[in-house]
């Protein structure tokens, strides 16, 4: 069943739930409790509110969406943990203050030159030092960057991007977990996450409205048929960065209409695998060549 997008008015109500410092402190104390249930009196003492009536009002404003109440007291709901988790994701430092310098991120698939990685404005940007190509620009929260040494940044970013793209291809929004629809976009001139491909895939969340564009090569990477082919031909995606895989950045794509079909051919040495997808990006056929 289709999910209606959350109206802006409802978002204002949700933001209002955590707009008071007492409510924020309640969430923080329950987070620190490590899923332990805290009684009303214990929670009020930890938050530091003397007026029990006023404190009960704030708890009521957070329940049941963000807090779960039972006979023993209060715990965070899944949504409550997500609110705190979102704060943690960006709390290590302002994204503009994270300076990891230029980090070696492997070889350029076009010229073989060194790929440099920098973190700017919440994105990991990879450019080739040799030919000057923009290899990829991938979003990453500050916690991903701040929690790892600079030398580990390329590996972490590659794994993080695989995780995010896998969620999308399995039908979950990367922001709110709502259902997403996948739509192919042919011959677009919009800048993709990687080099502009012949075929983009647009993922649209039916709940929050978030839109993500991936090239079709990244989408096909999550098909088990392609993973098996790569394994058989000696390509282990755990030992390389995604942007080093030429077929991901510059997929070999042919498109036909009525009905819509897109064929993506992945070649490794003398072996090739042709994958055919429909207008929902579901795999409808594959062939070794």
Locations of regions flagged by a protein language model:
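Basic, amphipathic "hinge/linker" alpha-helix immediately C-terminal to the N-terminal HTH DNA-binding motif
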Residues: 72-90
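Short alpha-helical segments that sit at the start of domains
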Residues: 2-25
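Short Cys/His-rich "knuckle" micro-motifs
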Residues: 70, 116-122, 138-142, 180-187, ...
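A short, conserved structural fragment
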Residues: 63-72
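Short, flexible, mixed-charge glycine/proline-rich loop motifs
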Residues: 93-105, 116-122, 159-170, 194-199
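C-terminal regulatory/effector modules of DNA-binding transcriptional regulators
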Residues: 150-151, 162-289
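Short acidic, hydrophobic short linear motifs in intrinsically disordered regions
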Residues: 26, 34-47
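Short cysteine-rich clusters marking metal-coordination/redox-active sites
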Residues: 108-112, 128-131, 173-176, 205-208
């Amino acid at each position: 069943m289709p999910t209606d997008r959350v109206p802006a008015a409802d978002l204002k109500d949700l933001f209002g739930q955590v707009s008071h410092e007492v409510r924020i402190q309640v969430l923080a104390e329950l987070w620190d409790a490590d899923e332990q249930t805290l009684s009303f009196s214990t929670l009020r003492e930890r938050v530091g509110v003397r007026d029990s009536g006023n404190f009960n009002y704030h708890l009521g404003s957070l329940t049941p969406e963000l807090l779960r109440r039972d006979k023993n007291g209060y715990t965070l709901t899944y949504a409550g943990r997500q609110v705190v988790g979102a704060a943690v994701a960006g709390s290590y430092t302002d994204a503009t203050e994270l300076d990891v310098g230029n980090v070696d991120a492997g070889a350029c698939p076009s010229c073989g030159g060194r790929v440099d990685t920098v973190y700017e404005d919440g994105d990991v940007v990879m450019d080739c030092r040799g030919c000057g190509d923009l290899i990829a620009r991938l979003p990453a929260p500050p916690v991903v960057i701040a929690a790892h040494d600079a030398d580990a940044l390329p590996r972490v970013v590659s794994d993080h991007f695989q995780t995010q793209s896998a969620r999308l291809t399995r039908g979950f929004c990367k922001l709110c977990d709502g259902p997403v629809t996948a739509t192919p976009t042919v011959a677009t001139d919009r800048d993709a996450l990687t080099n502009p491909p012949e075929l983009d895939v647009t993922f649209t969340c039916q709940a929050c409205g978030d839109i993500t564009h991936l090239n079709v090569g990244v989408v096909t990477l999550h098909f088990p048929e392609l993973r098996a082919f790569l394994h058989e031909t000696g390509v282990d995606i755990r030992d390389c960065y995604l942007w080093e895989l030429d077929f991901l950045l510059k997929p070999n794509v042919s498109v036909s209409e009525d009905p819509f079909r897109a064929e993506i051919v992945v070649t490794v040495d003398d072996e090739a695998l042709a994958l055919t997808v429909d207008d929902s990006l579901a795999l409808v056929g594959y062939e070794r060549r």
